Amino acid sequence: SVSDLDEVLLGSVYIPSKEEVQDLAWGDIGWWLHILDDDINTVITDQAENRIWNSAMNSAYFGYTTWQMEVGRSYKGDELAADNALWDDLYRRINVTNIILDEIEDLNPATEEERLDALRVRGETHFLRAQFYFLLVNIYAQAYDPENAETTLGIPLKLTGYVEHDKDKASQFERVPVAKVYEQIVKDLKAAVDYFTQSPQTRLFYRASGEASLLLLSRVYLYMQDWKNAWQAADDLLKIKSSLKDYAVVKDEDEVISRTNPEILFSQGSLNVQNAFTGNGGDFCIANGLYRLYADNDYRKELFFTPASSSDSIALGRKYKRGLHQSYVSDLFLLRISEAYLNIAEACAMLDDPSGASDWLNIFRRNRIEGWQDVSYDQNTVIEEVRKERRRELCIEGHRWFDLRRYAVCRKAPLRKAIERVFAVYDWDSKMKFMRGEVFRLEIDDPAYVFSIPKSVLEFDTDMPDNVRPMRRLTEVINANFD
C-alpha cells in the first residue's frame, strides 16, 4: 500500500539524525566535506587538547584535509580507513528509491486520499534520488562544464529497482557522462515539483516538499551554468516563500540555524559540527580568509564565530547549537531560503543584469548587516560581490568545496585558486606539545578536486575507470616557539 511505501521511504531513504556527534569523524557520511576547503585550517598553539588530536586528527582527518591520494591514510601512514561509506550508503538509498518508484506504479489507490498520498510519496522519492545523485556526481566526477559535460566521465546511473548482473561482464555498472547524470537530476526535481503541485507536502522540514525541490533545482541549474533556468526556479520559490530571518533579533543564548528558523525548507541527517571547529590546539579553526570577509557591523561576525578559549584562533560560534545534543538540523543536507536569494542574485549577475543582482543582494543584506545602505554594483564588481556573500552566508553548510569547483569552470567569470592547508603536528605520545606545522597545497585545477572511486567498487567493477589523485607531499615546514 501507499502507507507501506511511505514507511520504507522514512526508514530506508531519508538519512536519520544522530544523537551526540562527539567529533566530526563520528558524524554522517560526507562529514569530511567541511575540512576540504579554504574556510577552515588547523590550529597552531603550544599544546593540543588530547581528546581531538590523538585520535581523529592523526587518523581520520589528515588524508582528507591535506588532499592525500588515499583519503583514508593516517598521518603516520600506518592506518588506512575504508573510503566507501558515502558511495555505498547513497547508492543503497538510491536503490530503495528505484524500488519505490517501480512499486508505486502498480498500486491502484482506492480513495482520493490514497491517490494524493501516492503523488506526495512520488514527489519525495524523486527529490531524494536527485539530492543523492547530485552529491555523488559532485564528489566523484569533475564539475559540470558546458563545453565538455557530454564527454566527461560521471558516475554510474542506476534507475531500475531490480538487480542487474551479467556474469559475463567484468563491470556491472558504467560511469555515464556528467551531462547525463545532471539530466536525470533535473528530470527528478521537475517531477518532484509537479507531484508536490498536485499534492502539497504538509509535513515540512524533515520531509521533502515542492519548495525544497525548487531550491535544489535552482542550485543544480547554477552548477550547470544555465543561468536563466536557475533564475526561474529561484524566482518561482521566492514567489511562494521569501521570509528571511532577521539576524538583528537573534537572542544572546540562541543559535541562528535551529528548528525554529523560518528559512529552513528541508533538513535530513545530523549536525556533524556540534563539537567541531573549537579553535583549540589539535582541532580545526575558522580560516582568517573567511573571518576577514565580515565587516564589524555584520551580525554574522559575532553570531557565526567566537574567539577560541585556549588559542588565538577563531572558533565556530552560534551558527548552530554547540555541545552534544540530538541533531535537529543538518550541516550538509540543509535547504534554506537564504540560498534562493543568493542563487537568483548570481543568475542575474551572470545574465548581465547587475541592477537586478544588486537589488536581491540589498534585500538580503538588510537582514544581515546593521544599518545596511543599499549599493548598486556594476557588471565589473557584481559577480565577485555575489560570490563573497554566498561564502559569508553559507559557510560550514557543505557549499564552499563545490562552489570552488564550479567557479573554476565558469565560462562567464572563471575563478581558480590554490588552497594551502597548515597541518599542525603535536607530540601525541606524551605531552601534546606543538612540534611543527606542515604545509600542503591544493593547486589550481588540481586532480584532487575529484575523489577517487572507492577501492571496494573498483575491486567489484574491475573495468571501471578511476579518478587518479596525485601523491601529495608537504611544501614547507613552519616552526613556532612558545617558550
Task: Show the residue positions of the predicted features.
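Membrane-proximal, proline-rich intrinsically disordered regions
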Residues: 1-52, 290, 372-376, 380, ...
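Short, surface-exposed recognition loops and adjoining beta-strand edges that mediate ligand/DNA contacts
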Residues: 6-11, 15, 44-46, 140-158, ...
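Short coil/linker segments at helix-helix boundaries
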Residues: 139-183
